[in-house]
Structures are given as structure tokens and as C-alpha cells.
Amino acid sequence: MKKFTLDEIDHQILDILIENARTPFTDIAKQLLVSAGTIHVRVKKMEDEGIIQGSTLSLNYEKMGYSFIAHVGVFLEKTSMTQAVIENLRKIPNVTVAYVTAGKYNIFCKVRAKGTNDAKDIIYEIDDVPGVNRTETMIALEESINDKKRMMHAIFKEL
């Protein structure tokens, strides 16, 4: 399979879209001194190659009343139950991230809640998932770094 290569214009397009995925192609074209058609064609090609996959919406959970963050380490009864447990965790909307891990926990989850009572109920719900042996919870005091943009910029500099 031939590797798709990005040139400097592609990098600049991606840099702009990383900062704001809703930037109009005409604005990008003006910044890069190319036509809007060029931007459209290049973005379409990057979408076709799977480099760009949709666009995302970022929410401010705190402003929506979900400022409490907990990380839950999940111990399974048997590792063969991993996929079934993951499928059940998908049904709990407050579980926003789940990783299958090697090490102390079988699964590691990020949970968003309104407060401690809400978090307690969510953790009990996780504990009740068939296949879960027990959990350990860590409460986040502050989300100090949550910046996917820096990683994306670093990757594009390597390409």
C-alpha cells in the first residue's frame, strides 16, 4: 500500500483545521494564497485517504454541570470477559473513555459526573457490570493537560 504524503500546503491546511475545524475553505485559501477549490480538493483527498476523519465538537463539561472527573481502574473476573465488559461500559453514558490495559487494571475508565454522589452512583453501576470483580477509583483534582492539538501539530512536523 502506497503511503500518502503530505506537502507543505497540506500541513498548513491541517494546522488551520486543527485550531478550528469549522474554518471556511475560503478563509483558509486567503491565508495560504491559493484558491478555495484547491483547499476543497486537498481536504477531500485527505478525507479519502483517511487522514481527516470527520470533524469534532468540543464541549465545556464544567459549564454543563459535569465538572467532577474520576478515573476508575476495573479488575475483571476473567480477562476473557473484556469485550463483554467494554460493551456494557459503552451503555453507561458517563464513562467517556475506556482503555483495555496491561498492568494493574484490566480496563481503565474516565468518568464525568455532576458531583460525588453522581460519581458514586456511576461507580456502583460499573461495579454491577457482569464480569467486573472490583474497581479502584481516583478522583481528579484538576485536568491540567487535555490538548490533542499539540500532538497533532507534532505529528505533522514529522511528516
Residue ranges and their predicted role:
Residues 1-159:
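A compositional/biophysical signature of low hydrophobicity enriched in polar/charged and small residues
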